[in-house]
Curated annotation (Swiss-Prot):
One of its GO terms (biological process) is rRNA 5'-end processing. The keyword Nuclease applies. This is Putative pre-16S rRNA nuclease. It is an enzyme of class 3 (hydrolase). The lineage of its organism: Bacteria, Bacillati, Bacillota, Clostridia, Eubacteriales. GO terms for molecular function: nuclease activity. It comes from Clostridium acetobutylicum (strain ATCC 824 / DSM 792 / JCM 1419 / IAM 19013 / LMG 5710 / NBRC 13948 / NRRL B-527 / VKM B-1787 / 2291 / W). It comes from the Bacteria.
Length: 135
């Protein structure tokens, strides 16, 4: 059982992968978004390479729990994933994962440049680990 966690942003998609037993998550890459077709192609290749059987996508809800503009964009992209990749998708509340990821990297004393490069992948790891802890 391999689960792929994704943090979908406007410019990048952070990607994390579970271990085969589904206990831990680790960041594997950050996809630089080009266009929908290319983004789906890269995700599909990752799903095939790692034999993924579920995708967990972070849903950026507002602090009061409502669905906002960014959430609508993510939900729309997840519909495109469903149409092109034959893997079930689970949505996971991702409120504050990017803030938490940045805080953890600050505590690790990473430079601003390194944090910027890693933040989406680390956020995807937090999303996936949260999901794994819940199942």
């Amino acid at each position: 059982m391999r689960i792929l966690g994704i943090d979908v942003g406007n410019k990048t998609i952070g990607v994390a992968l579970s271990d085969p037993l589904g206990f831990t998550a680790q960041g594997i890459t950050t996809i630089r978004r080009k266009n929908e077709e290319e983004d789906i192609k890269e995700l599909k290749e990752l799903c095939e390479k790692y034999e993924v059987d579920t995708i967990v996508c972070g849903l950026p809800k507002n602090m009061n729990g409502t669905i906002g503009f960014q959430s609508e964009k993510v939900l729309g992209f997840c519909e495109v994933i469903k149409q092109n990749i034959n893997v079930p998708i689970k949505m996971w509340d991702e409120r504050l994962t990017t803030v938490t990821a940045n805080r953890a990297m600050l505590e690790a004393d990473l430079s601003r440049k390194k944090r910027k490069k890693l933040v989406d992948k680390v956020a995807a790891t937090y999303i996936l680990q949260g999901y794994l802890n819940s199942i």
